[in-house]
Amino acid sequence: METILVVDDEPDICELARDCLVAAGYRVLEATDGEEALRIAEAHTEPIHLLLTDVVMPRLNGVALAGQLTRRRPDTKVLYMSGFAVVGAQLEQLSGPALEPGDPILPKPFTAEALTRKVHEVLARPSPSRSPFSRARPRPDQWMP
């Protein structure tokens, strides 16, 4: 059984996602912000196959959360959710680090069918740490002047 960590600062979204994913046969862990998600991931000793996270959240946004979590758990795949119709620099102005082209995103609101289809699609992709085309993001201190 695959484990999915669902993170959204809206409890109703977490509950909806949890109910849909449990019904589809997944094990679900829930957090209402990025910091709580990192604590849950640290305490969870088994693999977390997918991080399903909102993009715009207080304190630690979804992109920053994904970066921290995948550094600790490189085989964890990431699916973003967002109710905002903005990407790239516009999103960065709202919430910190921005999505990159090709990052999988599920628009909110979503249906149970759309959620389970997108989760299945992302889980079927090769693990980021095993892909020869892994998009490791350099830290700012590693950038060339």
Q: Language-model segments: what does each one mean?
A:
Residues 106-123:
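C-terminal output helix
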Residues 54, 82:
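Active-site residues of response regulator receiver
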Residues 15-23:
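Charged docking surfaces used in two-component/phosphorelay signaling
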Residues 39-42, 63-76, 91-96:
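Short amphipathic alpha-helix used as the core "switch/output" element in two-component signaling
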Residues 57:
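Receiver (REC) domain active-site loop signature in two-component systems and cognate sites
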Residues 30-50:
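Acidic, metal-coordinating helix/loop segments flanking the phosphotransfer/catalytic sites
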Residues 32-36, 60-65:
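Acidic catalytic/metal-coordinating carboxylates
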Residues 125-145:
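CheY-like receiver
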